[in-house]
Swiss-Prot record:
Residues 155-229 are annotated as: Interaction with S100A6. Residues 74-229 are annotated as: Interaction with SKP1. Pfam families: CS (PF04969), SGS (PF05002), Siah-Interact_N (PF09032). GO terms for molecular function: molecular adaptor activity; protein domain specific binding; protein homodimerization activity; S100 protein binding; tubulin binding; ubiquitin protein ligase binding. CDD domains: p23_CacyBP (cd06468). The modification Phosphoserine is found at S3, S36. GO terms for biological process: cardiac muscle cell differentiation; cellular response to calcium ion; cellular response to leukemia inhibitory factor; heart development; positive regulation of DNA replication; response to growth hormone. Residues 38-59 are annotated as: Disordered. This is Calcyclin-binding protein. The lineage of its organism: Eukaryota, Metazoa, Chordata, Craniata, Vertebrata. The modification N-acetylalanine is found at A2. Residues 169-229 form the SGS domain. Gene3D superfamilies: 2.60.40.790, UVR domain. Its main location: nucleus.
Length: 229
């Protein structure tokens, strides 16, 4: 039952993360319904566990373990990272984390993700889920370290001596979308014209007048230069 509760809790946390990031109404409605179903199932299983009695009257009941608080989990969004030839290292600052029991700091790795859960730190739980890592990692060789007020997640690179420019594939795609696209075989002036055209379309009246004036002056200068030859 304990493993089922843990799996439901992980499902709930992931749905919450997706819900926070989603903007489409249809997707949000679907995720909201799924969140309600998981919360209901989680409550039912916790009630079943608390009501379960020993099979024999003379059997001592097992020690009651406080369930993971479901109502107050803090999403970790601030972190830093760097890399070596073998590892990508993620640094998360959590005041007092070195004082909680070691089993309260859990990290689950897959080839392209990791899931950090810190239980009962100053009465709160802390969660960080990172999916779609830029490149594959070795699950068996990845690990964590707990230092003073800091958790360090060590993702072992599957391909050593390779550089990660970004932590996740999503971050890479977002950054590349921000870069202007250049066609090396195209006329350089055509790229400039496309940029000016976009500025003109998005600009206000003053901007459009400025671009028109610059365009006319440029054409007049070109015409004068042509007549000199």
């Amino acid at each position: 039952m304990a493993s089922a509760l843990e799996e439901l809790q992980k499902d709930l946390e992931e749905v919450k993360v997706l819900l926070e990031k989603s903007t489409r109404k249809r997707l949000r409605d679907t995720l909201t319904n799924e969140k309600s179903k998981i919360e209901t199932e989680l409550r039912n299983k916790m009630q079943q566990k608390s009501q379960k009695k020993p099979e024999f009257d003379n059997e001592k009941p097992a020690a009651v373990v406080a369930p993971l608080t479901t109502g107050y989990t803090v999403k970790i969004s601030n972190y830093g990272w760097d890399q070596s030839d073998k590892f990508v290292k993620i640094y998360i600052t959590l005041t007092g984390v070195h004082q909680v029991p070691a089993e309260n700091v859990q990290v689950h790795f897959t080839e392209r993700s990791f899931d950090l859960l810190v239980k009962n730190l100053n009465g709160k739980n802390y969660s960080m889920i990172v999916n779609n890592l830029l490149k594959p990692i070795s699950v068996e060789s990845s690990s964590k370290k707990v230092k003073t007020d800091t958790v360090i997640i060590l993702c072992r690179k599957k391909a050593e001596n390779t550089r990660w420019d970004y932590l996740t594939q999503v971050e890479k795609e977002c950054k590349e979308k921000e870069k202007p696209s250049y066609d090396t075989e195209a006329d350089p002036s055509e790229g400039l014209m496309n940029v000016l055209k976009k500025i003109y379309e998005d600009g206000d009246d003053d901007m459009k007048r400025t671009i028109n004036k610059a365009w006319v002056e440029s054409r007049e200068k070109q015409a004068r230069e042509d007549t000199e030859f």
